[in-house]
Amino acid sequence: ETSGTAFFAYGLMWGVNHGLLDKTEYAPVIEKAWNYLVSTALQPDGSIGYVQPIGEKPDPTRKVDAKSQAPFGTGAWLLAACERVRYLDGSVEDKNSPSIKVEVKNTTKDNRNDVVELEAKTIFEKLGIGGGRQFVVYDGDRTEVPYQLTHDGKLLLQASVRPASSTELTIVKGQPADYRFTSWGRVYASREDDLAWENDRNGWRAYGPAIQKSGQRIYGFDVFNKNVPCPMLETFYHSELTSYGLQDKLRKAGRGGECAALHRTLTYHRDHGYGMDAYTVGPTMGAGVPALMEGKDFVYPLCYKEVEILDMGPLRFSARMAFAPVQVGQDKDVVETRVITLDKGTHLNKCEVAYANLSEARKVAAGIAVHKSMPDAYVMNKKLGYVAYADAMDHPEAMNGLIYIACLFPEGLKSVEYVPMAKEEAGAVGHVVGVSNYEPGDTFTYYFGSAWSKYDMPDMAVWQENVERYGRQLKTPLAVTLK
């Protein structure tokens, strides 16, 4: 029977891994159990069979077979499999475990608290492990440091280094703690396929196929303002979505006053002490989407068609969006792919954009919608490669502060421009954009992001300095050396 065998196998391997059981004595039993788990319990389609029904004791007169399945049996199998990896790799730390020293050096005049990258394969080889989270990272005070393994084979570490200084981290075999997620996101199918993501600074969202199918014209990135470092998206969406049904009942019962009061209490369009959505996107770039250009017109691919989440915290969130084909000039099936990456501790997302089926070079832009409430509150800096804007939010009279938005172009720009709209759309009167040349087959890389005056960005001058400093730091990354 699978669940019992798996639990015993896990326990015996755990005992060997932690030096409580003699491997020579228990290895034959462990191998017998594991052989059953992989040759009999594991089915060709990946399911786990031969699991007794929940709540029942073993009964030799009753038979289980490959179709006898239950979630707890699968969980027990996976528990044993994880311990099996540590058993084979010997990855539980002991005094004889090899260690790796990692020096992180800051040659700049800025205090740095960056997410840095190493090749995960190199770490696995040096520790003699097959892969996975089978090691622990410590700082100089023997405090565990959170890390993340990415979809593209990187090991991410967060390093805090003073100006013109260095710090040393130590990597050893062992079982890491479960880290608190700060950079994460998901698709909210219950809210018309929103892709929403956040870190300890702010949150954003992109609109999906359900919005496009409904006929709503919302193209750009939206902003979730936060004034707490902990994840808030689940709270935002749960509070907003669960209130809809209750409001409906109150409205139909003629209890409009109670309905309005409930809305004010639960909606994420009001600040209840941890943040709010008070940004209008509409048929614009919103807070930083890209678009190919035809003359002074932007060619939007509208909402994403498909999305794949690549990395899910705790230090980095990344996702790849693909869009429906659009016509650009004579090219009828131009498909945009957009990869966004957000690390812990930063206000800015990395955005890598590529266009398939484009036959000739085009101008490409990324920028920010300028709203009529603050039509002149933008800054364009071609030399340092960014545009920025202070947005008064949906209801300026509510005095909920300002949203500071920016697009940063570390690879340089052809121009920075204010492009007025032919007519006002959703309160927007124009865009402030950075424009580059795009060659077929290239990747257009820029950064977009935002901050809130009710959290950690007091004014536009500080926001500009933040963006400029980030640009400097991109050009001078922390130096990482293995010892």
PLM features per residue range, with description:
Residues 9-10, 14-92:
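CBM-like carbohydrate-recognition segments
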Residues 94-186, 217-220, 225, 229-231:
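Alpha-mannosidase-like glycoside hydrolase catalytic domains involved in N-glycan trimming
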Residues 98-109, 360-419:
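Polysaccharide-binding surfaces and accessory modules of carbohydrate-active proteins
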Residues 130-155, 327-329, 372-388, 409-422:
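Solvent-exposed beta-strand/loop surfaces of large extracellular or lumenal domains
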Residues 154, 159-161, 406-483:
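Beta-strand-rich recognition/accessory modules
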Residues 167-177, 319-323, 442-454:
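Short, hydrophobic/aromatic-enriched beta-strand segments in well-ordered soluble domains
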Residues 175-295:
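Solvent-exposed N-terminal domain segments of exported/luminal and surface proteins
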Residues 305-364:
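Acidic, contiguous internal or C-terminal segments within carbohydrate-active enzymes
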